[in-house]
């Protein structure tokens, strides 16, 4: 089964007090819902309309569990604590992987996706 992912990218600096209140609730809410923090950083190179603020990536067992984590009472309480203290872009998506087979013919290398 494909994994589910929660991606949060801040579009503007957060209000420090509201951000702290949010963080105290959001992390435990995501862990309680089965999330595993893969990355969290403010060291971001943004391209094509991206913004270089805090970015967080959390992995879940499935797309459905990632959506359930966002909609959980615990995470909604964290959002209430944030109370508009940050402009964020939230994405929940299903991770679909593909395999790459390299084919070498003479001196040429080809990549075949399947």
Language-model segment annotations:
Residues 1-54, 61-67, 71, 94-104, ...:
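Short S/T/G/P-rich N-terminal loop/turn motif that feeds into the first structured element of a domain
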